[in-house]
Amino acid sequence: MEKFKTLFFVKSSLISLYLALTIPIPFISIDKLKIISMIVFVIGLYLIINITSDYVETCNNKISYKNSFICKTLGRKNLEISWKDIKLIKSLPTSQDSKVYYFITNKGENFLIPQRIENFEKFLSIVSKNTGIDINDTTYISPIWTYQLLTFISLLMIIGELIAFLN
């Protein structure tokens, strides 16, 4: 069984952007709202970390999408697809000139292929091995450097906020 977690730079970009945008709020809040804004900040951070904890598992028989506690609470269900039920992979363009990919099953169901997971190439080779489908054109939804850049810019924002606060 193989487990594929959300890509580190996807998680880090979302968490660092959340921090960059919300760290100042408790400090600029009026006195009556400081404690509440700190509590909301911590709850929001927990939610972001939890939501980015989804993962995919593969084994000899199937692929499983495992959702985080919060996603399940919001109604998103874990999914399992048998390898033998996957008929083909279909790509659709996005508005950002990228592509999203779907597993199309023998029943005509569409399941979004997770494109933001660690070891994506290994995941694709497992898909190809178990389904016999050509995966050569399947790629990440966006280049990794975009997530790295967003993380870097968010960290610069946090540093700038700390410098402004300390002065």
Pin down the residues of each PLM region:
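Short, charged/polar low-complexity linear motifs in solvent-exposed/disordered segments
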Residues: 33, 83, 90, 129-131
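Generic secretory/membrane-interface signal
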Residues: 5, 79, 128-131
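Juxtamembrane amphipathic/hinge helix adjacent to a transmembrane helix
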Residues: 115-142
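Short charge-dense sequence patches
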Residues: 31-42, 71-84, 153
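Juxtamembrane boundary at the C-terminal end of a transmembrane helix
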Residues: 157-167
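N-terminal membrane-targeting/pre-transmembrane regions
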Residues: 1-29, 108-109, 133-158
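N-terminal extramembrane/targeting module of integral membrane proteins
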Residues: 1-64
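Non-transmembrane, membrane-adjacent beta-strand/coil modules in membrane-associated proteins
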Residues: 52, 65-123
